[in-house]
């Protein structure tokens, strides 16, 4: 699924985007943001972040710099290593 989404975004970037020109109000552009979000967070969460970004990309939003949030590791108690002596 991840590679399919990346392929679709790459197709858009190389085949469609040059025809319509730069229109994104953000840096990085929405397609680059979504591509990076999928690479960092996976298809489900990255796709969600990309969709939220696309919904904010409209003439009434000021835009600006909006990086992909860093991945936060969520470790449950069962995966934590026990400290020696405890």
From Swiss-Prot:
Disulfide bond sites? none
For this UniProt record, give its keywords in alphabetical order, as a comma-separated list. Answer: Cell inner membrane, Cell membrane, Membrane
Q: Specify the protein's topology with respect to the membrane.
A: Peripheral membrane protein
Pfam families in UniProt: YidD
Q: Tell me which InterPro entries the record gives.
A: Membr_insert_effic_factor_YidD (IPR002696)
Record carries keyword Iron: no
Task: Name the GO cellular-component terms.
Answer: plasma membrane
Compartments (UniProt record): Cell inner membrane
From what superkingdom does this record's organism come? Bacteria
User: What does the UniProt function comment say about this protein?
Assistant: Could be involved in insertion of integral membrane proteins into the membrane.
Give the family from UniProt: Belongs to the UPF0161 family.
The molecule here is called Putative membrane protein insertion efficiency factor
């Amino acid at each position: 699924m991840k590679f399919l989404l990346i392929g679709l975004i790459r197709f858009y970037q190389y085949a469609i985007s040059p025809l319509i020109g730069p229109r994104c109000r953000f840096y990085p552009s929405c397609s680059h943001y979504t591509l990076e979000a999928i690479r960092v967070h996976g298809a489900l969460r990255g796709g969600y972040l990309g969709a939220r970004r696309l919904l904010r990309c409209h003439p009434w939003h000021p835009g600006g710099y909006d990086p992909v949030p860093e991945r936060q590791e969520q470790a449950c108690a069962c995966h934590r290593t026990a400290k020696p002596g405890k």
